[in-house]
Design a protein with these regions (language model features):
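Glycine-rich FAD pyrophosphate-binding loop
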Residues: 29-53
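Helical element adjacent to the flavin cofactor pocket in flavoenzyme catalytic cores
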Residues: 174-180
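Dinucleotide-binding Rossmann-like beta1-alpha1 core, especially the glycine-rich loop
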Residues: 57-169
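Short alpha-helical segments and helix-capping/turn motifs at coil-helix boundaries
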Residues: 23-25, 42-45, 104-107
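Short, solvent-exposed beta-strand edge segments and adjacent coil->beta transition regions
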Residues: 9, 116-118, 175
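A short, basic/flexible loop-to-alpha-helix module at the beginning of a structural domain
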Residues: 1-10
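N-terminal Rossmann-like FAD-binding beta1-loop-alpha1 element of flavoenzymes
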Residues: 10-38
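Short, glycine/serine-rich, charged loops/turns that create anion-binding
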Residues: 19, 44, 125-126
Length: 180
């Protein structure tokens, strides 16, 4: 880490120079422009750990493809509650970044914001059954209405050709896709 001058009494200290600290810092500055903020990063470059594309799915944790937000209960049911809460938070963050673009505080967002489909892929009968139940549970919420579910091999090849490469048509598999 390079040497830097450190304030003696900042109002806020943020640990890590990744997307979360950057976002929180910008929110705090928007709410209180005179606030003093210090960011401490142990690495030589900002956003090289969890925020780096090689270490993170880059999905913004929208709950569109993260299966851990919809665990299956012992009775086989799936609650969409946590996924809906995460998706709502994701939408609020998108609104915030859109506001920053409108205020010309973020320029050329197309250079760093890339819309890509959010996909979940599973194989095996039990996992296919789970993904179908997850999809059905999420369909009750408008944020997930545009999500697609398929067990169609050809469609999955179209959605994710590299994932499907070398797979057999006879294997049980399913996928969901959410374009954003």
């Amino acid at each position: 880490m390079s040497d830097t001058t450190i304030r003696t009494n900042p109002d806020v200290i943020l640990i890590g120079a990744g997307i979360m600290s950057a976002t929180l810092g910008v929110i705090l500055k928007e709410l209180q422009p005179n606030i003093t903020i210090e960011i401490h990063e142990r690495l030589d470059t900002a956003a090289c750990e969890s925020s780096d594309a090689w270490n993170n799915a880059g999905t913004g944790h929208s709950a569109f493809c993260e299966l851990n937000y919809t665990p299956e209960a012992a009775d086989g049911t799936i609650s969409p509650k946590k996924a809906i809460s995460i998706a709502e938070s994701f939408e609020v963050s998108r609104q915030f970044w859109a506001y920053l673009v409108q205020q010309n505080k973020v320029v050329s967002p197309e250079k760093f914001i890339k819309s890509v489909p959010h996909l979940s892929f599973v194989w095996g009968e039990k996992n296919v059954e789970y993904l179908k139940k997850r999809f059905e549970a999420l369909q009750s919420n408008p944020l997930f209405k545009e999500m697609d579910f398929t067990t169609d091999f050809s469609l999955m090849q179209e959605w994710m050709p590299l994932v499907m490469e070398g797979r057999e048509l006879t294997d049980a598999m399913a996928a969901t896709k959410m374009d954003i």
